[in-house]
């Protein structure tokens, strides 16, 4: 039984890994089309990891176990051990001075939307590297297991247990069918990202920076294309775009699904209330501290 579960878990991990391998071709194609330097490492990384994932998929085809809590734990662990390694490959090839540990750290930080980085002088880093960091964080905001959730219907297995294992979203799912939830998640995430990109453009941010920052803003991650992050722009309009879309990105998917894809208002959700109260308290503390530091008073 355990061997069957491991084989099936390997199949799901390989499928997610194949998706990330295909995503590596985006920076390569962008570099090829625009003329950026540093695109080739993404071609070789995508081919290498993609070939390995295809071999695993062929070796484990036909494995469709019944989803259980134990199986969910196995998949979660497999994913978090393997996907950061795959995503670190372009860093290792494109930045030879970067250690393996640093490359894995950068990839893990992106996928977990932590936002910590070991890279500096970002403005002089290859554009494909900056784009890859944004893509990783964007997918990380969606959730690696949410990506697996979207793919699972094509493997003819259910996936809500996996979603609960990885996601902090505990709200009641407003739609009963997994495939409908998957479609809704994709549309919501793409919609938020697209509108955020347009908002950054309207605020005067350059096109590449707008796309990169939109992906990391909606993901609530924090990766930037500048060492100073959003402070580089010295513009309150840019900051307000980030504030609004980071707030929207922090709301559970179930809220947007209920709002846009059902005919009823979203049910009251304690986690949303707590989220808003936490933001208000934190904002008040920051304002008070800032006023004290600038020697102003109420």
For the regions a language model picked out, list residue spans one by one.
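Membrane-proximal intracellular helices of multi-pass ion channels
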Residues: 1-298
């Amino acid at each position: 039984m355990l061997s069957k579960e491991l084989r099936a878990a390997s199949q799901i991990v390989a499928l997610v890994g194949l998706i990330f391998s295909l995503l590596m071709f985006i920076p390569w194609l962008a570099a090829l089309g625009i003329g950026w330097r540093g695109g080739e490492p993404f071609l070789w990384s995508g081919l290498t990891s993609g070939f390995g994932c295809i071999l695993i998929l062929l070796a484990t085809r036909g494995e469709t176990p019944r989803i259980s809590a134990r199986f969910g734990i196995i998949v979660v662990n497999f994913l978090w051990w393997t996907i950061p390694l795959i995503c670190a490959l372009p860093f290792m090839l494109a930045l030879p001075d970067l250690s393996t540990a640093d490359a894995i750290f950068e990839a893990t930080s992106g996928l977990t939307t932590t936002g910590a980085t070991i890279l500096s002088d970002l403005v002089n880093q290859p554009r494909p590297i900056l784009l890859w960091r944004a893509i990783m964080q964007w997918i990380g905001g969606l959730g690696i297991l949410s990506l697996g959730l979207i793919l699972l219907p094509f493997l003819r297995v259910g996936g809500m247990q996996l979603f609960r294992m990885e996601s902090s979203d505990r709200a009641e799912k407003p739609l009963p069918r997994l495939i409908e939830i998957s479609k809704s998640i994709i549309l919501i995430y793409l919609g938020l990202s697209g509108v955020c990109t347009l908002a950054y453009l309207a605020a005067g941010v350059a096109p590449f920076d707008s796309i990169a920052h939109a992906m990391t803003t909606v993901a609530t991650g924090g990766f930037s294309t500048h060492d100073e992050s959003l402070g580089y722009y010295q513009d309150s309009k840019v900051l307000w775009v980030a504030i609004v879309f980071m707030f929207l990105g922090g709301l559970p998917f179930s809220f947007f699904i209920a709002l846009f894809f059902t005919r009823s208002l979203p049910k009251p959700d304690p986690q949303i209330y707590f989220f808003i109260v936490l933001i208000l308290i934190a904002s008040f503390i920051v304002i008070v501290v800032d006023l004290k530091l600038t020697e102003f008073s109420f």
